[in-house]
Amino acid sequence: MKMKSGMEQAVSVLLLLSRLPVQASLTSEAISQRLRVSPSYLKKLMRTLVQAGLAESLPGTKGGFTLTKPLADITLYDVYQAVEGRGSMYQGKGLLQSVFEGESHCVLETVMAEIEDKWSNLMREESLQHVMDRVGELYDLEKIDDWVIKQVKGQL
């Protein structure tokens, strides 16, 4: 199973935004520099996250992006749907019907849909808060918090 790199980037952006102090935001320029992605790509990703209701865009010269809700209320499935879209992962071509003539129902499509449902349910159970908790076990969050504060102060 393969996901676009946008999934990891979107999760990273949302986790980064969660480190913001109350009433603060991060510019797309700061986020793109931190993630080492092109500013134009980051703007497209941010538009996607805003349209999905996961991030908010604040206008003005001191504007930027912030989360719309706590990480505990955002699931990996929410992010996946925002980045990958709502279509089915598996698109059958009807080859089984060609091999085993006579049946109009694609068994493989049914099996793949069942697997996709299970996978989707697992992603619905994983909040970004749980991901952040695991990040905190492995990384020094103080470093990113210091970087975030520096960026916020630079906007003032």
Swiss-Prot record:
Any one GO molecular function term: DNA-binding transcription factor activity
Keywords recorded for this protein, A-Z: DNA-binding
InterPro entries attached to this UniProt entry: TR_Rrf2-type_CS, Tscrpt_reg_Rrf2, WH-like_DNA-bd_sf, WH_DNA-bd_sf
Residue ranges occupied by any HTH rrf2-type domain in the UniProt entry: 2-133
A GO BP annotation: regulation of DNA-templated transcription
Gene3D superfamilies xref list: Winged helix-like DNA-binding domain superfamily/Winged helix DNA-binding domain
Signal peptide: none
Pfam families xrefs: Rrf2
Gene Ontology CC entries for this record: cytosol
Name of the protein described by the UniProt record: Putative HTH-type transcriptional regulator YwgB
Annotated organism of origin: Bacillus subtilis (strain 168)
Organism placement in taxonomy: Bacteria, Bacillati, Bacillota, Bacilli, Bacillales
